[in-house]
Design a protein with these regions (language model features):
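Helix-biased detector of long, well-ordered alpha-helical tracts
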Residues: 1-170
């Protein structure tokens, strides 16, 4: 199972929109508040659940860091895109074509993505959006995922979610 900390997957899109006067104050305030939150409590909460991999999501975006974790373990994963926590209005901004200037570079990592279904261009932009002070991406044994998620939420990451699962060796 793959878990992620609260609403931190698309800071690049939000601030690209902000520079164009297209990001709402609520979205920017939410992003700034979230970026000030430490990942420390979530990191401590996950320790007793046998994490197999963990990283903070930063410049390579959620997908870039996930690919790095998967390659290191020689496995693949399936994401449930509807479960990925997003800042307010980010999907609409991505659908309007507002993306970070780093997206093309990060998007080159997409050659490792076997299948991407859904509203492809906007989903691609969100998954590869570079982050500043992103949340944690954590791999734990599937049998421990729900309990780990509960512990992370109890530690203060209310929007943490199980966003996918590891499929096995590729």
């Amino acid at each position: 199972a793959v878990e992620r900390n609260p609403e931190s997957s698309e800071v690049g899109i939000l601030f690209a929109a902000h520079m164009r006067g297209r990001a709402g104050a609520r979205a920017i305030d939410t992003a700034l508040t979230t970026m000030r939150c430490s990942n420390g409590p979530s990191a401590r909460a996950m320790r007793s659940f046998g994490p197999t991999a963990a990283t903070d999501v930063t410049g390579f975006g959620l997908a870039g860091h996930l690919l790095e974790m998967l390659r290191g373990a020689g496995v693949a994963a399936e994401l449930d895109l509807a479960r990925i926590p997003l800042y307010p209005s980010v999907l609409a901004l991505a659908e309007a074509g507002i993306v970070s200037s780093l997206l093309p570079e990060n998007g080159r990592l997409a050659t490792s993505v076997a299948e991407l279904s859904g509203p492809d261009a906007s989903v691609h932009a969100i998954l590869f959006d570079p982050q500043t002070a992103g949340g944690l991406l954590i791999g734990v044994p599937e049998a421990q995922a729900a309990a780990c998620l509960d512990a992370i939420r109890a530690a203060g990451a209310d929007d943490a979610a199980i966003i996918g699962r590891v499929l096995g060796v590729y």
